[in-house]
Amino acid sequence: MAEPRIFTSPDELRSAVGEELGPSDWLEIDQKRIDLFADATGDHQWIHVDPEKAAAGPFGTTIAHGYLTLSLLPSFTPQLLRVEGVRMGINYGVNKVRFPSPSRSAPGCAPPAGSWRRPRSRTVSR
């Protein structure tokens, strides 16, 4: 497992604004995960859930929903950072989120061919 950067206080975390954290461990985004997310959100667009049609589409395979990719952030955070003396964290929100490249579902692909993600994070001020 990736080793998180340990901050001794929220102030120390704030002083790290602009620094890169990570990378995390690799995470496979497979078709089963994509299908479960589609069922949970009701977003069954063919680029996500129809492998046959998606094979002839612009990405050559199905792709993960952008919001699926975003929803994985809580699972990566403990791999990237920990702040001592903090009992819990909450999602305050996100600004200027973009999805510049798709997360492809491609069984048997080795990282980083598209079915895997290994995030890095950059601390920013609010």
Summary of predicted features, one role per range:
Residues 35-38, 70-74:
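Predominant activation on well-ordered alpha-helical scaffold segments within soluble catalytic domains
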Residues 55-61, 71-117:
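Hydrophobic beta-strand-centered segment that forms part of the acyl-chain substrate-binding groove
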Residues 2-64, 81:
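Catalytic strand-loop segment that frames the active site of acyl-thioester-processing enzymes
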Residues 1-16, 99-126:
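HotDog/MaoC-like acyl-thioester-processing domains
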Residues 9, 18, 66, 75, ...:
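Glycine-centered flexibility motif
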